[in-house]
Amino acid sequence: MADFKIVVSDPKTKTYQFDITGAEANQFIGRSIGQTVDGATVGLDGYTLTITGGTDNSGFVMSPTLPGPRRQKVLIANGVGYSAVAKGVRRRKFLRGSEVAPDITQINTKVTGYSDKAIEEILGGGSEEVEAPAE
């Protein structure tokens, strides 16, 4: 069974993190960067999420340019996972493929389709009033 941390970034407000396991997690396996997922898998009914990246259990980032789910050592000059310190410098780095596999730990997503309800309302924290602490 796969366990994922799903990071949902809402461009309008802020970022939320969900832990999913079991059947919900299996819906992400085999999906690639750029594909859409129903938000109901993380409890956000009516929302549409797009996979933007992620990291595996060793911390290697997923690259949208590499096909498949495996880890590869590639020569890169700039892009996901490496920023060159000078022009023309290239380096051999480990990167993960763009496909979600069971050994991925974190999946980054962004909201592309919105529901009538705000995410705060769905999660139950939108209408609460916080009292000032007693002095």
Swiss-Prot record:
InterPro entries registered for this protein in UniProt: Ribosomal_eS6 (IPR001377), Ribosomal_eS6_arc (IPR020924), Ribosomal_eS6_CS (IPR018282)
UniProt-recorded Gene Ontology molecular function terms: structural constituent of ribosome
Cellular component per GO, a single term: ribosome
Keywords: Ribonucleoprotein, Ribosomal protein
Record-level GO BP terms: translation
Keyword presence, Ribonucleoprotein: yes
SMART domains linked to this entry: Ribosomal_S6e (SM01405)
Keyword Protein biosynthesis in annotation: no
One Pfam family, short name: Ribosomal_S6e
Family indicated by similarity: Belongs to the eukaryotic ribosomal protein eS6 family.
HAMAP family: Ribosomal_eS6
NCBIfam families, per database record: PRK04290.1-3
Descriptive protein name: Small ribosomal subunit protein eS6
Gene name of this polypeptide: rps6e
